[in-house]
C-alpha cells in the first residue's frame, strides 16, 4: 500500500478527509487516527465536520458549539503534503482478519497485512478475541455483537471449549456493552 510506506509517513501527521470520512463514526475516526502510528506516523487527524461537532456537543455540553465551529481549521487550498496526497476508494476495501499475535503477518500485498476473510478457509478456533486499545470502543463492540447475533441467527454455534475474550477500551464501554446485552 503506497500510502502507508514508511518513507512517506515516518514522523509525519496523517490527515484524513474527503467524502469517505462522512461514512465513519467518531469512534471509527478515533481508531483510524490511533492506527496512524502503526505505519510510523506521529499522529493522525481528521477534518472537522458535523460528526465531530455532534460528538463534542454530546460529550461536552458546556462548550459553545458556535464558537467551536468557528475555531475549526481546515487545510489551506493548495497545501503541500510531503508524504503525498493519497486517494483511497473505501468501497474497494475488503473485510480483513489479522493473524493472532502478529497483525503484521499475512498476505503481503494487502494494505493492512491481514488475511482476506473469504480466503481463510476452514480454521480450527480455540480462542476468539475482539477489541484492543484502538478497537475497543462502543461502535467496535456493537459490531462484534452484530456479527455474533448474525451467526447465532443463521444457526451457527461455538464449539465447546472455545474461549472468547473482549477487550474493552474503557470501563464506560464495558458498562454500555453489559447494559445492552452485548457482553453476554
Residue ranges with predicted function:
Residues 1-184:
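Fe-S-dependent hydro-lyases/dehydratases of central metabolism
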Amino acid at each position: 500500500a503506497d500510502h502507508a510506506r514508511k518513507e512517506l509517513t515516518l514522523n509525519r501527521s496523517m490527515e484524513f478527509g474527503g467524502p469517505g470520512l462522512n461514512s465513519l463514526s467518531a469512534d471509527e475516526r478515533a481508531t483510524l487516527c490511533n492506527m496512524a502510528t502503526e505505519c510510523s506516523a506521529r499522529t493522525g487527524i481528521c477534518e472537522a465536520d458535523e460528526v465531530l461537532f455532534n460528538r463534542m456537543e454530546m460529550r461536552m455540553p458546556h462548550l459553545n458549539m458556535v464558537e467551536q465551529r468557528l475555531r475549526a481549521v481546515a487545510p489551506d487550498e493548495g497545501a503541500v503534503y510531503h508524504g503525498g496526497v493519497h486517494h483511497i476508494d473505501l468501497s474497494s476495501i475488503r473485510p480483513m482478519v489479522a493473524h493472532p499475535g502478529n497483525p503484521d503477518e499475512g498476505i503481503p500485498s494487502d494494505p493492512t497485512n491481514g488475511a482476506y476473510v473469504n480466503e481463510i478457509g476452514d480454521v480450527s478456533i480455540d480462542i476468539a478475541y475482539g477489541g484492543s486499545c484502538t478497537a475497543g470502543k462502543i461502535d467496535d463492540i456493537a459490531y462484534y455483537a452484530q456479527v455474533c447475533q448474525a451467526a447465532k441467527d443463521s444457526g451457527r454455534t461455538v464449539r465447546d471449549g472455545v474461549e472468547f475474550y473482549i477487550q474493552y477500551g474503557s470501563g464506560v464501554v464495558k458498562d454500555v456493552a453489559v447494559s445492552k446485552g452485548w457482553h453476554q
